[in-house]
UniProtKB/Swiss-Prot annotation:
Disulfide bonds join 278-295, 308-330, 311-342, 658-704, 714-739, 808-844, 820-856. Expressed in normal endometrium but overexpressed in endometroid tumors. GO terms for cellular component: endoplasmic reticulum membrane; extracellular exosome; Golgi apparatus; late endosome membrane; lysosomal membrane; plasma membrane. SMART domains: Ephrin_rec_like (SM01411). One of its GO terms (biological process) is positive regulation of vacuole organization. It is a single-pass type I membrane protein; Single-pass membrane protein. This is Endosome/lysosome-associated apoptosis and autophagy regulator 1. It comes from Homo sapiens (Human).
């Protein structure tokens, strides 16, 4: 699509050529008419032109800078005898502001009363409709052809005239307001703008007649601090196209406030041949005016007036009105109550006042009267830290003392004042607070009181209209946090503000709480819509600098000047700010004592040390505990760290050093997540607004390590898009363990980088690391992700954020499931829940799954086994391999292969066969031997039995057997007890006679002496 300014540039050039041709065309027509009259002498005779029938114009400037003044009839052909052309003024000639060029005598004359001029300029201050020459265009940010359909959704997203100003769009479309002008000399363009919301990109730039933009130093507009601001840019001679362009980047439910522009003035244009009448509601009471004044309240004026007219008594008008309105009857919505300051008697008066400006009438039927004032009541006590003087005013107690609102008391020895501001009694507005009213119609401050004191609370008074912003501001010069807090670079809390409030509304009222740092634009922190019961809100302050806190209440957003809902109010009961520099104290807190020559004095404990209340000495917190730095009293101030975490050196936070252990009945699993310590990013699926703008939720995560330092950074660069590469600019950023931002990619925006906006912290502190699904009230449902299939439970990191919102009363929480996935190399992959593509299903609890091989347990001896090879060539190898599937990472390495000397199976086979053969032979020999031996013994035994039966023998019984044939006389037969095999062998070898026969001893049955036969 062509650049919008290009077509306007062309039209400007065409218009310039047309302007140069006009005088020549008129002269040609006049010459043709005269010639026609001469040739047609019989035609009707034309009268001489009167001054009212023609006007003067200049011809185009020639190369020498000269031009001619010519008379041009209003209607060609009606008259004749026009004045002859004469030499005109120099092309560079111009009149001053408040003057116009009288073309008759070519001199500057002052404007008459009721009129004004800018000299060589033009002004646009009426925006009931788009002025002539302006163009309003809209486009979708998508640059590709796929956005053609969504572009149609942006046709109505344009700049809208609203009477005194023109307002930009508030959606994600790009709206452009353009004006083309041809300058005869160098000039300026200046305008007023109201730019309160940084979620809109607002740029103003100028293109010259070569369609080249001028210097970009003033292109990107800065947000306005208070009300309207003035902006001016120099213009070069020639064609200039002015662009006011806005694009909103608020893709959530919050609708940003539009950019407003008014009073556009351009100088350096062609001469002004007449003065402009003052618009209704303004006047010029003297000649030579360069601007018109506004009519005061209760007066009006018509167009071109020299003075304003007073309204009738029964009518009223606001400042700059063109008419008067009838005063309505006064109601109870037209007045409010307040309290006077305490008098010398310690009493205050209840006062009723009409809301300003008073537009109602007390004389009409049914009108209410202002209630009687002057009822006296006793003054409430002073606020804590203040004391009451003799004239019943409240003054702050000196440093080193405290009070509950009565008398000041010195802090006891061993204590120090806890300085701050605690406002809970509202008899007068504190000196460091101010209140005003910002008009919801023209966004100008009215110098009125927006909040009124009412004893035990402060509330919103009645404004000029229901859409006015009732503003209350508290300014704190700085903070004085404890020394232990200042030493902790990761703990961002330097102080906190707590206030109790309620809203009572019948329509769509809104209460805004905003914070400004170093006088920068107030940033909305929280918004409450509709009626809210009495409740408390706490905001943590993270920067030690001058800070302003602002409460703004708007009864309705309807763009009308009416006062119908003044009974809709916001009330603030108390405001408490801690650790305020030069503040006051309502109590004294224990401190560490330091001995000196003059006694003992308070000193600060080192970081990570608590104060013993009894002795005033400093003691280090135990291991694995952190110190509550803002209340470091007693050992109970040391809070234990969660599972899987430990404290840092100064006991300010608990962190995980990227290690974890899980015990089971059979073994201990150790983890090391060091490979996952670096920050990683993850983008959710694309989302689209109602206008078709594509955006992503972009997450940045830092899991562990780094001594607990938060490494994830999310930024808001909406107002910093045009900073050149290599240069730094201001952009809001937050640091956390896990943060989220809304990203519009560069291919959509067309800028050098994608737009990052609305950064949010999701994890400010680590609660613990465990395999349990619930910890400290935070649950990580397993069903949000695909189930684990390896039998190794997920290790879950639990975090909490410090941000507390209406929808997340306990703050946001984040869980990161770290799952062992051996096939995914480092760093692995991050996943969002399948059912909640933005990481959360409720907006408060965010869940992530991180799968990686680095999430597996460390390898140990239980994760591998040995494989022994066969013996080859006398060598045997033992190889160690991982068990499959391998479910570990890192840890120990596999042992080296082990080589041993061995015997082959052939050798052992030969040895076995040889041993078997020998054994068989030996057994055979022994068997034969014993068989033969047994045969001999059997034979001898049978002989003895036979001899024992010979009872009829004549000879006396012999003690030995007879010598048989073939037997040796020397053989002895002895009956012995049973012998073993080896005993028999021994006997055999020892009794063998030299002749080869055995000697067997015999034993008689009577046990007598052995006898040799």
């Amino acid at each position: 699509m062509a650049e919008p300014g290009h077509s306007h540039h062309l039209s400007a050039r065409v218009r310039g050529r047309t302007e140069r041709r006009i005088p020549r065309l008129w002269r040609l027509l006049l010459w043709a008419g005269t010639a026609f009259q001469v040739t047609q002498g019989t035609g009707p005779e034309l009268h001489a032109c009167k001054e009212s029938e023609y006007h003067y114009e200049y011809t185009a400037c020639d190369s020498t800078g000269s031009r001619w003044r010519v008379a041009v009839p209003h209607t060609p052909g009606l008259c004749t005898s026009l004045p002859d052309p004469i030499k005109g003024t120099e092309c560079s000639f111009s009149c001053n502001a408040g003057e116009f060029l009288d073309m008759k005598d070519q001199s500057c004359k002052p404007c008459a009363e009721g009129r004004y001029s800018l000299g060589t300029g033009i002004r646009f201050d009426e925006w009931d409709e788009l002025p002539h020459g302006f163009a309003s265009l809209s486009a979708n940010m998508e640059l590709d052809d796929s956005a053609a359909e969504s572009t149609g959704n942006c046709t109505s997203s344009k700049w809208v005239p609203r009477g005194d100003y023109i307002a930009s769009n508030t959606d994600e479309c790009t709206a452009t307001l353009m004006y083309a002008v041809n300058l005869k000399q160098s000039g300026t363009v200046n305008f007023e703008y109201y730019y309160p919301d940084s979620s809109i990109i607002f740029e103003f730039f100028v293109q010259n007649d070569q369609c080249q933009p001028n210097a970009d130093d003033s292109r990107w507009m800065k947000t306005t601090e208070k009300g309207w601001e003035f902006h001016s840019v120099e213009l070069n001679r020639g064609n200039n196209v002015l662009y006011w362009r806005t694009t909103a980047f608020s893709v959530w439910t919050k609708v940003p406030k539009p950019v407003l522009v008014r009073n556009i003035a351009i100088t350096g244009v062609a001469y002004t041949s007449e003065c402009f009448p003052c618009k209704p509601g303004t006047y010029a009471d003297k000649q030579g005016s360069s601007f018109c004044k506004l009519c005061p309240a209760n007066s009006y004026s018509n167009k071109g007036e020299t003075s304003c007219h007073q309204c009738d008594p029964d009518k009223y008008s606001e400042k700059g009105s063109s008419s008067c309105n009838v005063r309505p009857a006064c109601t109870d919505k037209d007045y409010f109550y307040t309290h006077t300051a305490c008098d010398a008697n310690g009493e205050t008066q209840l006062m009723y006042k009409w809301a300003k400006p008073k537009i109602c009438s007390e004389d009409l039927e049914g009108a209410v009267k202002l209630p009687a004032s002057g009822v006296k009541t006793h003054c409430p006590p002073c606020n804590p830290g203040f004391f009451k003087t003799n004239n019943s005013t409240c003054q702050p107690c000196p440093y080193g003392s405290y009070s509950n609102g009565s008398d000041c008391t010195r802090c006891p020895a061993g204590t120090e004042p806890a300085v701050g501001f605690e406002y809970k009694w509202w008899n007068t507005l504190p000196t460091n607070m101010e209140t005003t009213v910002l008009s919801g119609i023209n966004f100008e401050y009215k110098g009125m009181t927006g909040w009124e004191v009412a004893g035990d609370h402060i509330y919103t008074a009645a404004g000029a209209s229901d859409n006015d912003f009732m503003i209350l501001t508290l300014v704190v010069p700085g903070f004085r946090p404890p020394q232990s807090v200042m030493a902790d670079t990761e703990n961002k809390e330097v102080a906190r503000i707590t206030f109790v409030f309620e809203t009572l509304c019948s329509v769509n009222c809104e209460l805004y709480f905003m914070v400004g740092v170093n006088s920068r634009t107030n940033t909305p922190v929280e918004t409450w819509k509709g009626s809210k019961g009495k409740q408390s809100y706490t905001y943590i302050i993270e920067e030690n600098t001058t800070t302003s806190f602002t409460w703004a209440f708007q009864r309705t957003t309807f763009h009308e000047a009416s006062r119908k809902y003044t009974n809709d109010v916001a009330k603030i009961y108390s405001i408490n700010v801690t650790n305020v520099m030069n503040g006051v104290a309502s109590y004294c807190r224990p401190c560490a004592l330091e001995a000196s020559d003059v006694g003992s004095s308070c000193t600060s404990c080192p970081a990570g040390y608590y104060i013993d209340r009894d002795s005033g000495t400093c003691h280090s917190c135990p291991t694995n505990t952190i110190l509550k730095a803002h209340q470091p009293y007693g050992v109970q101030a040391c809070v234990p760290c969660g599972p899987g975490t430990k404290n840092n050196k100064i006991h300010s936070l608990c962190y995980n050093d990227c290690t974890f252990s899980r015990n089971t009945p059979t073994r201990t699993f150790n983890y090391n997540f060091s490979a996952l310590a670096n920050t990683v990013t993850l983008a959710g699926g694309p989302s689209f607004t109602s206008k078709g703008l594509k955006y992503f939720h972009h997450f940045t995560l830092s899991l562990c390590g780094n001594q607990g330092r938060k490494m994830s950074v999310c930024t808001d660069n909406v107002t910093d898009l045009r900073i050149p590469e290599g240069e730094s600019g201001f952009s809001k950023s937050i640091t956390a363990y896990v943060c989220q931002a809304v990203i519009i990619p560069p291919e959509v925006t067309g800028y050098k980088a994608g737009v990052s906006s609305q950064p949010v912290s999701l994890a400010d502190r680590l609660i613990g690391v465990t395999t349990d699904m619930t910890l400290d009230g935070i649950t990580s449902p397993a069903e949000l992700f695909h189930l684990e299939s390896l039998g190794i439970p997920d290790v879950i990191f639990f975090y909490r954020s410090n941000d507390v919102t209406q929808s997340c009363s306990s703050g946001r929480s984040t869980t990161i499931r770290v799952r062992c996935s051996p096939q995914k190399t480092v760093p692995g992959s991050l996943l969002l829940p399948g059912t909640c593509s933005d990481g959360t299903c409720d907006g408060c609890n965010f869940h992530f799954l991180w799968e990686s091989a680095a999430a597996c347990p460390l390898c140990s001896v239980a994760d591998y086994h040995a494989i022994v090879s066969s013996c080859v060539a006398g060598i045997q190898k033992t190889t160690y391999v991982w068990r499959e599937p391998k479910l570990c990472s890192g840890g120990i390495s596999l042992p080296e292969q082990r080589v041993t000397i061995c015997k082959t199976i052939d050798f052992w086979l030969k040895v076995g066969i040889s041993a078997g053969t020998c054994t068989a032979i030996l057994l055979t020999v022994l068997t034969c031997y014993f068989w033969k031996k047994n045969q001999k013994l059997e034979y001898k035994y049978s002989k003895l039995v036979m001899n024992a039966t010979l009872k009829d023998c004549d000879l006396p019984a012999a003690d030995s057997c007879a010598i048989m044939e073939g037997e040796d006389v020397e053989d002895d037969l002895i009956f012995t007890s049973k012998k073993s095999l080896f005993g028999k062998i021994k006997s055999f070898t020892s009794k063998r006679t030299p002749d080869g026969f055995d000697s067997v001893p015999l034993k008689t049955s009577s046990g007598g002496l052995d006898m040799d036969l």
